[in-house]
Regions:
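Structured, active/binding-site neighborhoods that engage oxygen-rich ligands
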Residues: 1-190
Length: 190
């Protein structure tokens, strides 16, 4: 039920809560995604405040021990997951950039993407997070003052870099097949 959530000074919003969930997960090293999806997201449901519908639905799925895109879920639930295009993924980009900022963006992009599919399936959410992540990555690599519009120019100049669907074996194969099934021409939308 919709309601207004008052967040007092010193308290955390859902975005800050999820950034902290992700940050704790990243401390687990290579197994960060498993920790994020199996521990942090399910536990977040106990104390969340103001989380978006897509994230809450994905968390319910993780609580059931099922990936949000799993073919074992109701088709309408999987479709709803792939229709989810909010900004929650973008809000969680910063920890990946801070952790991997010295590396090539492709590594950062892979982590942002894997983080994103934990809660959202639509290209709008995932590409938005990759664009924002690239802007953060580019800004942190600068050792001089940013000029007005410089990050926008960097995004435009490097669109092929940040907008590519990460090519990694880490992406569950069922995620790809369900994406095409749920959103016809997923890659065209991408």
């Amino acid at each position: 039920f919709p309601h207004e959530e008052i967040i007092e000074e010193g308290e955390y919003s859902d975005d800050t809560q999820l950034i902290l969930c992700l940050s704790r997960s990243l401390q687990k090293g290579e197994r960060w995604w498993e920790h994020f999806t199996q521990v942090e997201l399910p536990f977040w449901s106990v104390y969340e405040r103001g989380g978006g519908g897509a994230t809450k639905r994905a968390v319910e799925s993780w609580l059931d021990g099922v990936m949000p895109w799993s073919s074992s879920r109701k088709p309408q639930d999987v479709k709803r997951y792939y229709d989810a295009g909010g900004n929650g993924v973008a809000m969680r980009s910063l920890p990946h950039v801070l952790r991997l900022g010295e590396m090539e963006f492709s590594k950062v992009a892979t982590n942002i993407f894997l983080d994103g599919i934990a809660t959202h399936g639509h290209p709008r959410a995932l590409l938005g997070a990759l664009a924002y992540g690239f802007a953060l990555w580019a800004a942190f690599r600068k050792d001089s003052k940013l000029a007005y519009g410089e990050l926008v120019e960097e995004l435009i100049k490097n669109v092929d870099l940040w907008s590519a669907l990460p090519a990694t074996p880490s992406i569950p194969s069922e995620w790809r097949s369900q994406a095409e099934k749920s959103l016809q021409d997923y890659m065209k939308l991408w």
